Structure formats: structure tokens, C-alpha cells
């Protein structure tokens, strides 16, 4: 079956996606859709975006051969795409600069965002400061308590941080609150959504801004290995860092020339939390069902009555109970494989990379590293695996120190 990576005019990837929004929000979403349609291919806009990504954010980021980890595991050659080195400490900056610049062009004076781990909140706060936009970040109370360093950074950057005390007080509740705020303020406010979810055009727009990751990897791996990788691996929350890595390798969207992108295996790693046999996980594709939330049709964790269940992960950025619609489509198509890693596996991976390579990964990224630790040793030594190291782990040190002691990792 052909992998069509373009959504239709109504924002559907196959049966997934769409615009499930109240009437009051339709003018805001339509305004955004038309503005993005006009600017995405505008040469001046793209040149300005490229300028800020290079000179402000520090692109391109390195593609690093993890020689020590490769030798220790004894299998596939492991490369790390170093998004942790991007200004702000994670891949989120690619999207926040793009959307904030778009908001500025639309004449908006205020941006709002949801955040879980805090990295998107930090990235949005940075972009707000850069472009002179009033900024408010909605963050679940639970996440504000476990991500204090990022809360402090957001405030330092001039953003208002609003704790959310409804529901389970985590990421999905922050999204709910941000959408409510946008409904009342969209005339002067842009909702800078942080991942490839939500109503059309957000999944496509965020993916496009993040695709710089995969475009660079494609060029860099050809320079270093003279061929494409065998495996691309990324963690999955809502799924933006993974879509950013995967999308340029989906064969109908690139001019492949002599390289054979259709043979590149793509693997997304969800949060298995305390185990997939428990209710404490965030594995929406592995354990979820089709449903509608936050303006889109996708896979969500639900109870028998179709009510959204709480997601759990030791990583604040992976405890969203759903998945972006393009991921749901690629899963159904079989083009991308989805696996999972438990808290304990992620913590072990965090420690392994830190002590083997001297690189401290985010707990989110550690889920992808865990896949390599479990599987790379069984692969051929000529195989090449690229892992998206989506963020740095400074924000997670307190969580890791406490958890490692309890779990004995």
C-alpha cells in the first residue's frame, strides 16, 4: 500500500485526524490554516525561519557516532542525532520558533502553550522573548512539581506559568486549559501547540517545522556512511520528535535518487511505565483504542465506557494518553513499528549513555536509547541505527536520583 504522507483537505491521514472542534473555535483554526498555507512556501518566511534556526537556535545539530556504546553492545552502529544540543535543550525549539514567527506574521501579540516536561514551555518562552510576544504557559500541577528547573526557566524568560489543577493535573489537562483559553482570546492570541496532535493544521504544521531533524540526518548519514541508515528510532509522546526524524525518509516525500528510503525501518518507542500489564503506562498505540480528543481522531487510552484514562510515565513528556494522527495512520499502514520501554528500562538507558558516552539524555529520549540497548546487540555489525536524542537530561536529575535508588538501576 502506498504511504501517502499528505493529509486531505479536511486534515485526515486516512481515517485519522480532522477538526473536532466547537463552532466558536473554527474561525481561529481556519485563520491559522490559511496563514500557514500562504506562508509555508513563502521564500521570505522560510529564509527568516532558517536564519533563526541557524543563528539563534544553533542548527544544524551534530549526528554523533556513539562508538563506546556501539562497542559495548556489540551490534549495530549507533548514531545519535544531538537535538539535546539545540538552544533550549530539546527539539521543541524547532517548532516554537516556527510557530512564533508565524504568529508574528499573523499580527498576534500573545502566545500560549501547554507543556508536560517543560521543554515546550521553555521553547515557547524563549520564542516569546525573541519575538516580543506576551507568553502564558499552562502546566499540570503534578508536572510543575517534578519539573521545577524548567518552571524557573520559563518565569526567568518572562512567561506566566499557570498551574492546572483539574483532572489528573498533567499534560492532557494542560492541553484542555490552553484550548479553553484560546477559545476566549484567539483574536490576539496564537495557541502554540507543542506536538503533532490537535485539530488540522497543527499535526501537519508541527511535523513540517520538526522535519529539519530528518532532513539533516539524511544529509549527515550520507556524508559519514555513504548510505541511509537501517533503523530510525525515536521516543513517542504526542510524537513530534519522531515525525521530525521519520518524515523526510518516507519515500513518497523525497527524491530518493540512488538511496532506498523505503527500506529504512522506523521505530517509535512509547512509555510502558510500570508495565503494559498494569494501568500505569502511556502506550496509546500499543494499548489504546480509536477515539476523539483535543480536536482529532486517533488512538487514545480509554476505559470500557470510552472515557479517557490517565497516562503514566516517569517521563513528564510521555504521559499523554494519545498519539498524533499521522502516527496512527502509519501504524495502521505498517510503515512504522511501535514498541515500548518501561520506567526501569529507561532509567537504565539513562545511566548507560551517561556513563558510556558522557552524554546525559532526557528521560524521554532514554526510552529510545533503551530500545537500542535491548536490540542493537542482536543486529548485524554493518547495520546502522540512528536514534533521535531529543533532549538533555538536566531537568530530570532529581527524578532519576530518587528513582534509581528505589529501583536499584
UniProtKB/Swiss-Prot annotation:
InterPro entries: Trp_synth_b_CS, Trp_synth_beta, Trp_synth_beta/beta-like, TrpB-like_PALP, TrpB-like_PALP_sf
Keyword Aminoacyl-tRNA synthetase: no
Entry cofactors: pyridoxal 5'-phosphate
CDD domains in alphabetical order: Trp-synth_B
EC category name: lyase
E.C. designation(s): 4.2.1.20
HAMAP family, per the entry: Trp_synth_beta
Subunit and partners: Tetramer of two alpha and two beta chains.
Biological role: The beta subunit is responsible for the synthesis of L-tryptophan from indole and L-serine.
Protein name per its UniProtKB record: Tryptophan synthase beta chain
Organism: Methanococcus voltae
Gene behind this protein: trpB
